[in-house]
Structures are given as C-alpha cells and as structure tokens.
Amino acid sequence: MIKNKLLVVLIILTSNSVLLESSNLVIKNAEIYDGIENNSYQGHILINDGVITKISKTSVPYADKVYDAKGKIITPGFIAPDTQLGIVEIGALNVTRDDEASIYNIGFSIHDAFNPNSVLIPWNRANGITSAITLPRNTSSPIGGLGSFFLLDSNLDISSEADIAMIGRFGGSGSSSRAETLALIDDMLSFASSLDKKDMSSDASIDEVIDDSSLASHMDFKLRDVKALYRLINGNLPLIIKTHRASDIIKLIELKNTYNLNLIIMGAQEASLVADEIVENNIPLIVNPINNIPNSFDELASNINMTPILEKAGATLMFNVSRSHNYHLIRQGAGVAVANGMSYGGAIKALTSNVAKTFNLNDRGSIKVGNMADIVVWEADPLEPSSMPEKVFINGVDTDLTTRSTRLRDRYIRDLEKPNTYRN
C-alpha cells in the first residue's frame, strides 16, 4: 500500500515537472496585428520551442500552457533600428561608452562590447522593445563603423547577428564641405569596387592592396577596414547614411546606382520633396515622426506630415528617436505619425517587419508560422505612450518586466507609513 502511494505521488510530481518545463504555449483570444497586414484579426497563436507553429482564427490549439489575452492587442516585438543599447550606459561618462574607436575606422565593430546586463535593456524591454540594432558613433571616415543586431533578453548567452550594417554621414552634419565628403565617399566606394577575390585571398594580399593604393595609405586603412569595404560592395551589406537635405539624398541615390549599394537613409527630414525618387530606387528610410521643426539649414522642409506623404508614395519606413536611452519612444513617434495621417497598420510595420526585412532578419518582425515568437501583449493601444505591455515574449519565453525604476519605486513606497528612520 505504501509503495503504491509513493508511486502515485511520484507520478504526480513527474507530471507537474513536465508541465512546468513544457515548451509549448498558446496565446488565445488576441487581437493580432501581425506586422504583415494593415488590419488586425482575432486569433490564437501556438508556440513550440520558441517558434510560432500555428495561427488559428477559429479553434484554440492545444498546448500545455495557455495565456488568455482576453481580446487585447498583440503585436510582434518592436525592433529599434538606431540605438546604442548595450554599448553606452551614461553618455557623459566615457568609461561607460564603447561606441568609439581610436585605431579602426571603417571596420570598427561594436559587437563584442555588448553588455546584456545594461540597466537600459530591461527599461526598453518593459516598454515593448524586444530587439535592437546597436550602432557605433561615426568614425573619422564619412562611412565606417559596423552595427549589430541583439535580442534584448538580458541573457549572458547573447543572441545576436554581428556586423549587419555599416554607418555613414553626409551633409551639414559633417565638419568639411559636403563636396569633399561626397568625393571621398565616391573614392572609397571606387576602391572597394576594384577589389576582387584574389585581392582578398589572404592578409598578405590585402596588405599589398593597401600599399598600392594612395587612398588606402592616406586614410591609413587596416585589414579590417578593407574587409568591411569589400563586404559593402560584394556582400550586399546595408549602408545607413544619415543625411537630411533633398539634394543630398539625390546625390546618394546616384552613388547607390553607380555602386549597386544596399542604401538606407536615416534622418531624411526633406525626404517628402523627393519621395518618388526614393521609392523608385527602393531606399528604406529611418525617420523620426516627431522631429518636425528644422534644426539646421539642411532640414528646412521638415514637416509633421512627412510620414503619411512617404507612406502614400510607397516608401519603406522605420522609426527612431532623438533621445538616447528611451528608444521605446519610437512607438510614441508612430502614434504621432498615425495622428497625422499614416495608417495604423503601416505604423506597426515600421516598428516591426520593415526593420526585419531591411536588415535581413528573416525570422523576426512579424507574427507568422515559422518565425521566432517575439510577441508583446498590450494592456491597451501600443501607440499610446501610457499603455504598457502586459506580457513580453522573446523566443517564446515570458520575460521579466522588472526594471531598475520599478525596483526603486517599490523600495521607497513599501514602508511609507513608517518614519524615515525606520524605512528600509
């Protein structure tokens, strides 16, 4: 009898253990904005081992774990395309910055400096940002510096894609004449396009190329720099160039067509003046919908209606913010864009699938079968800043929404009725 009772207890404990460790989950009764279609639909999502395996609009799929969204909006996890998450903690404190290089220029990669325990990561994750593209600060070269993609799950076993984009700048933000900057970019791209597989076959071969090139010698190219330039021309590496003036955008379009660049323009405050040219040449844009007041003579055509104008023209849009740390404010920018005429579904795409497609993040950015389950359940409208995530799943894992701010709040309100001396 005792043996039978022990056996029953063992079976119960084992079954409970399996249930707790089960890796399949269904999110039911959700209003789904999938990042693909403009409109939402009611449905249920089945997740197995971190992957979306079924989406049903009728019956609820079976799973060991069930989360009832109760009609709330769910979206793909938002992807911030322009951040310094994990490499800058306090901008004014140099010892917390890993975004600048003193030796390398074009080939400078920030990937290995990423800190998954940055206190800024939980803060942005708790506001719906599940992944980010982290970019270095511009080097002394007009193009140069490599950004990487990171999941914001705070795991020491970092999930990332290294060196997925190069950055650059052109226009009034530079320290020299834009004519000289454009000529230098052209010369660098011409040098890169002259490289072949034989030149890149060994470090010794690359050293010979550097010695034989007056440009490479003058700019003190290193091995990493030449390899990065070769990838830019021959590996379809995205090139993000920050510029604003309409005439500068036209010049960059000419360079794109000359060298077959995978060009992305960031800033682009005068993009609405050349919307047709941007769309015709298939150039994605990273813009700040809130930034509608000219900050320089390069931005005189800035206006609050830019995003709906560009969307109507057919441009691929992504959003960034001018403030560091609070990268989650891209959803506030999306809300401003919608308030001024952009479609709601288009704004969700700008926060999710447009980023994934632009940077070749093939299994992220949308809620569809086969994609990783980066999903946010919102308590209300995700484009309303006062609305917060109720649940954030990254790779199907229900992540912790505790932040340093919430811990401080809880610490100091816990014993409010006690005199200050006796508070913990």
Please place each PLM-identified region on the residue numbering:
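Sec-dependent N-terminal signal peptides
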Residues: K5-T14
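Active-site gating loops and adjacent loop-to-helix segments of metal-dependent hydrolytic enzymes
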Residues: G91-F114, E208-M219, P284-V287
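Polyanionic/metal-chelating signatures
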Residues: A126-L263, M388
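His/Asp/Glu-enriched, well-ordered alpha-helical/loop segment
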Residues: I90-G91, V95-A101, N105-G107, P238, ...
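Glycine-enriched alpha-helix->loop->beta-strand junction motifs that scaffold or abut catalytic
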Residues: K256-L263, E280-I286, G314-T316
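C-terminal cap of metal-dependent C-N hydrolases
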Residues: A30-Y33, V369-Y412
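Histidine-rich, glycine-flanked metal-binding segment
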Residues: I32, I36-T75
